[in-house]
Structure formats: C-alpha cells, structure tokens
C-alpha cells in the first residue's frame, strides 16, 4: 500500500506488520519503569487520529520497540521519544534525525521537527530505513518509525518526572 504522509512516501504492508505485532510483547514486559507503564496505559486515552494512524499501519502501540521519557513539559505532560518498526520501504522522505557531528567513535544527531509528520498537535513521527533493535524474525523490508509525543500522566501514582 502506497501512502503519502507529508514529505514521506511509504510503501507499507499493514497486514504483515499486524501479524508480527500479535506475537510481540507489551512495552511493560521489558521495562517496569513509571515512564513505560504510563505510556502503555496512556495508549487507551490517545486521540482517535493517533490510534487510527498506528492501526492503519498495523502497529500495536502498546508493543512498540522502544519508548523513553525526554522530560516533563511545563503543562504537566511528558515528552516521550521512541521508535517502532513496520513492514515497508520509503521511496521518498528523510529522517528527522540529522547528524550534526561525527568523531572517530561517535555521532551526534539533532531532531528536526521540519522533517516530521504531525498526527495531532502533540504527536509527531518520522521514518527512516536505518533501523535499530529490530525484533528477531521481523518481516523484511523493514522501516523504523520514530516518535515524539507529549503525553499526559495517567497513572494513579505520583509523576516522578516533575
């Protein structure tokens, strides 16, 4: 299926992606920190456009590959980053992660919002063909979808990131 998402043109296979996600573990099966537990529970409260977007690509948001807290925002939401995988290719577009420096043993990247697709006011994604932590057996070809999202604190416990 060919789709256009802002500057990105993707060829995806949502059914192949969905079939693999059925076998994957939940975020909290791999990490029990407050940030991961909050993200997994907050999925139930995501705006319809965010839920429908992930569903249309075959991705179960509660089973994404990597999620992490960047910081608490002044409005009390948590700025999350992370990524997940989907079956497909990217004939057009470039990642929001832009290299700013390279040394003999490391690279430094910066996130450029101009290279993202906005799903909602608080949720942006970017795509890239260079992938990290691809799950064993994930069908090829594989794309990585990078996430940046401001998500409310929904756990019934104190927010340790404030």
Question: Which residues make up each language-model segment?
Answer:
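A structural detector for beta-sheet-dominated domains
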Residues: 11, 55, 62, 87-89, ...
């Amino acid at each position: 299926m060919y789709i256009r998402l802002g500057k990105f043109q993707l060829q995806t296979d949502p059914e192949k992606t969905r079939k693999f996600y059925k076998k994957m573990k939940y975020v909290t099966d791999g990490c029990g920190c407050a940030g991961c537990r909050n993200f997994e529970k907050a999925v139930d409260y995501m705006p319809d456009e965010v839920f429908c977007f992930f569903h249309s690509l075959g991705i179960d948001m509660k089973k994404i590959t990597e999620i992490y807290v960047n910081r608490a925002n002044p409005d009390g939401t948590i700025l999350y980053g992370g990524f997940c995988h989907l079956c497909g290719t990217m004939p057009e577009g470039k990642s929001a992660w832009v290299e700013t420096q390279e040394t003999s043993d490391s690279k430094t990247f910066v996130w450029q919002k101009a290279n993202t697709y906005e799903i909602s006011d608080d949720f942006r994604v970017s795509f890239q063909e260079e992938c990290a932590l691809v799950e064993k057996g994930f069908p090829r070809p594989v794309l990585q979808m990078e996430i940046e999202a401001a998500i409310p604190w929904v756990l019934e416990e104190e927010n340790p990131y404030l």
